[in-house]
Amino acid sequence: MKFHGTTILVVRRNGQTVMGGDGQVTFGSTVLKGNARKVRKLGEGKVLAGFAGSVADAMTLFDRFEAKLREWGGNLTKAAVELAKDWRTDRVLRRLEALLLVADKENIFIISGNGEVIQPDDDAAAIGSGGPYALAAAKALLRNTDLSAREIVEKAMTIAGEICIYTNQNIVIEEV
C-alpha cells in the first residue's frame, strides 16, 4: 500500500503524549487540500488517533475503533487488537486501505488491515509517506535534547514537510 499525502507522528515524553499530522491531501500529483485534519481525540479525549490512507476508509475505521474503545472500557491495547482482528477478517473492512496510529499516556500502536498491531520499541512512531523522516527527526530530538513532546512533534513534522513532497507544514497537534 502506498500512502501519499500524509505524515502522522506521535511522541511520548515526561507523561505527555503528543500526536501531529500534516494537512495535505494529494490526488496523484495534485494537492487537493492543504488543511485537512488527520489527527483527533477519541475515547472521551484519552486516546489520540491519526490515519494514513483513504479518508473515507479512515473515518470508517475511526468509528469502529471508537466503538471498540467503548466496548473494552477504554483499554487501548484490547481495542487495538480487536479492531485489527475485525479488520482482517471482515469481508468489507479488509478492503479498507489505511493505517491507524493510536496512542494514550501508556501505549502507542500502529494498526494495519492485515491484522498487525505494532507497538514501537521506544516513545515515538510515525506512519505515512513522510513518516520515516518525521520518525528519524523525532528520535534524534528525543535522544539529544530536553525538548517537550510537543516541541519534538512540531520540529520533526516541520522537517518531514521540508523533505517529503506529499507532506506540508500545516500541522494539527493533539495531546493527552
UniProtKB/Swiss-Prot annotation:
Keywords: Allosteric enzyme, Cytoplasm, Hydrolase, Metal-binding, Protease, Sodium, Threonine protease
Record text on activity regulation: Allosterically activated by HslU binding.
Binding locations of Na(+): G161, C164, T167
Enzyme superclass (EC): hydrolase
Active site: T6
Function: Protease subunit of a proteasome-like degradation complex believed to be a general protein degrading machinery.
Protein name (record): ATP-dependent protease subunit HslV
Gene giving rise to this polypeptide: hslV
